[in-house]
From Swiss-Prot:
Residue ranges listed under propeptide: 402-424
UniProt keyword Cytoplasm, yes or no: yes
Biased composition (Polar residues): 301-316
Residue ranges crossing the lipid bilayer per the database entry: none
Post-translational modification: During host cell invasion, proteolytically cleaved at the cell membrane in the region I by a papain-like cysteine protease of parasite origin. Cleavage is triggered by the sporozoite contact with highly sulfated heparan sulfate proteoglycans (HSPGs) present on the host hepatocyte cell surface. Cleavage exposes the TSP type-1 (TSR) domain and is required for productive invasion of host hepatocytes but not for adhesion to the host cell membrane. Cleavage is dispensable for sporozoite development in the oocyst, motility and for traversal of host and vector cells.
PROSITE patterns: TSP1
Glycosylation sites: 364
Organism field: Plasmodium falciparum (isolate t4 / Thailand)
Free-text domain note: The N-terminus is involved in the initial binding to heparan sulfate proteoglycans (HSPGs) on the surface of host hepatocytes. The N-terminus masks the TSP type-1 (TSR) domain which maintains the sporozoites in a migratory state, enabling them to complete their journey to the salivary gland in the mosquito vector and then to the host liver. The unmasking of the TSP type-1 (TSR) domain when the sporozoite interacts with the host hepatocyte also protects sporozoites from host antibodies. The TSP type-1 (TSR) domain is required for sporozoite development and invasion. CSP has two conformational states, an adhesive conformation in which the TSP type-1 (TSR) domain is exposed and a nonadhesive conformation in which the TSR is masked by the N-terminus. TSR-exposed conformation occurs during sporozoite development in the oocyst in the mosquito vector and during host hepatocyte invasion. TSR-masked conformation occurs during sporozoite migration through the hemolymph to salivary glands in the mosquito vector and in the host dermis.
Protein known as: Circumsporozoite protein
Chain's gene name: CSP
Amino acid sequence: MMRKLAILSVSSFLFVEALFQEYQCYGSSSNTRVLNELNYDNAGTNLYNELEMNYYGKQENWYSLKKNSRSLGENDDGNNNNGDNNREGKDEDKRDGNNEDNETLRKPKHKKLKQPGDGNPDPNANPNVDPNANPNVDPNANPNVDPNANPNANPNANPNANPNANPNANPNANPNANPNANPNANPNANPNANPNANPNANPNANPNANPNANPNANPNANPNANPNANPNANPNANPNANPNANPNANPNANPNANPNANPNANPNANPNANPNANPNANPNANPNANPNANPNANPNKNNQGNGQGHNMPNDPNRNVDENANANNAVKNNNNEEPSDKHIEQYLKKIQNSLSTEWSPCSVTCGNGIQVRIKPGSANKPKDELDYENDIEKKICKMEKCSSVFNVVNSSIGLIMVLSFLFLN
């Protein structure tokens, strides 16, 4: 089998090489034929009949290419070559003679300028030329000079004078005027104005200002001062008066009021208090008295005895109330907010795991707390964290408080995971 494959490969290679050589031969002949068909003689009418020479071999092809090269190198203009071809067959003597003739013919020609004679004036000359004209006139002089110009003009005039100057300018103008004067100055300005006036004066100043105003007035005076202020105000008023004083204060206040009154008095005091209150009331009354005392209490209950707690006389509702309060206390233990002690213990417990993410809830049942480090304090060492300023806290509430339910739920989850692992 290998021998057959080798023989087939070699024979295919030889066959392809033979075809490639044959293709090269025909391709060369075809290209030569196309070139030959495009060559014309000098007359431009007959084609070179060289097509049949391409089939006689390499020598004929070389001759054909040589002939084509010669024909392409020739100049199509026969008139340019006739003189040279005719000159090639002549003798040296005739050639020398022809060269002399050619040099004579090729001698450069110089055109002479036309010079008018003395008695022949220029026919194109200006017939109105002044015979007495200044022979030294500037040939570049302005041809549009004003014929009515001042003959007595200043010969030392400023050559850089403004060509657009005002022709109606004042001839009596001040020669020492300020060259930098304001061109937009007020033409109706006061000629008797104060030469020492303030150059930085307020341009929007009040033209009706008081001419007798106080020159020593306060420059920082209040621009929004009350224009209707009391002209008889006390000149010795307290400069440190309270700026936040009550603007609606009683104008008829008691002038003999106690100057040492309590500054921390209750702002929500009863404005309708009894004006005839007992002046000898107990000054040491209980400040923590029950504000929600029953106003409709039975006055006859006070005579049932002076006992307290379990020492009270028999009351039919006492046992019922005590049992209800006990049940409510147990019930509310799970809903009350965590105390400061609980928060502090929880922070110490998870101090090493604190981060900027919220921690798990501190309880599994009821209300707990979640904490995290504030983003601005994330780079502080954990032992330098301030629980008040660097720790953020929030209340979390856990609804599922049944331990039995938690155990069953965890057991079901564990069974599902194990069954998935072993069954697969």
